[in-house]
Regions:
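Vicinal oxygen chelate
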Residues: 1-18, 29, 34-88, 96-123, ...
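C-terminal catalytic core of tyrosine-transesterase DNA break-rejoin enzymes
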Residues: 126
Length: 137
């Protein structure tokens, strides 16, 4: 049986990536310095982060401790990534600069591409790759 999903102004259909971070992580200051706002944070008994919801200019995402029981590990343990977080922003250069100042590692500087995008890429302190982008043509 197929069911149609109708979004209202109150409940829009959107993606909210869940980024896995190492177990026993206590500090996510990078994301706050990068411009994220914390909505909520659930901590384990030892104070480490279980899950936190963050938002950057309306784009919601979650950080969650590693859950190896179903194969979810963070990029550092995996020695690589299987996806890239694409974030569309009004000013690619400003966001790239802010990320680098907050502690990210630049993978590729912001530049214009023939396919009509301005893009730059960085790796955050937990190993996640972010593609910062804007349509330009």
């Amino acid at each position: 049986m197929q069911q149609n999903i109708i979004a209202t102004n109150k409940e829009k259909i959107h993606f909210a990536p869940e980024l896995h971070i190492p177990n026993n992580t206590f500090n996510i200051d990078f994301y706050i310095r990068f411009g994220a706002t914390e909505h909520f944070c659930f901590r384990n008994d030892d104070g480490s982060i279980h899950v936190v919801e963050l938002e950057i200019e309306g784009a919601i995402f979650h950080l969650h401790e590693t859950m190896r029981w179903f194969g979810a590990i963070e990029p550092i343990s995996a020695n690589g990534v299987t996806s890239v977080i694409g974030l569309f922003v009004p000013d690619v250069d400003e966001v790239m600069d802010k990320a680098i100042l907050a502690g990210a590692t630049e993978i590729s500087p912001a530049r214009d591409h023939d396919y009509g995008y301005r893009q730059g890429m960085f790796k955050d302190p937990f190993g996640h790759y972010w593609q910062i982008q804007k349509k330009i043509g």
